[in-house]
């Protein structure tokens, strides 16, 4: 590796680190700090889709190809990026938690469903789930004999380990996307407090898969590669540039996954 020159991918991650540091700046208002966390995460998603996807393809198909500035192979760049991303994610989690702690002192925050103590609040969200969420979701039960369903890019899914009355294990999956017109719902008895839609779905998941016993549950989120070659031979014959770009966009949606995020509670069975 040429130590006199900075790798493009690592340089970009340093830029995103500077974005993250804005969320730690005491001169920045609390609401804007959360915006910088969101920008950091959106940037990182895009980095995975485009740059990590490209490095992964380079590692597979052109393993001896090297970066002309640093002399790093695709595999070396990929490993260096993933080490840096692990560090940045831990840093982001610490900063986010400090922001949430500060918001709490001002009476604002996100509450887990399991921490709701007020019976009227619980009745409200049970009714909200039945009325506003349940009609919009499409649960799927997956067995070993069935192909795994296609997971859309950057969508949050609830996954559950199911057990039938005969003791057979299956997996259930529910996309939260259709129910997410508003991701946060205000808690009636707690001014400034909110609950996430996906947390409501997770809590009432036994109502969705009522014929099964829930053995484990959690969240997953897939990020798909967006690295597609505009010179791909499959695009030959497209005289209309707009039509060609529409084809490219459709292909991007179905490229291979390059990241799987799993909640702590779901890791045991995913």
Language model segments and positions:
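N-terminal non-catalytic structural scaffold regions of very large proteins
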Residues: 1-267
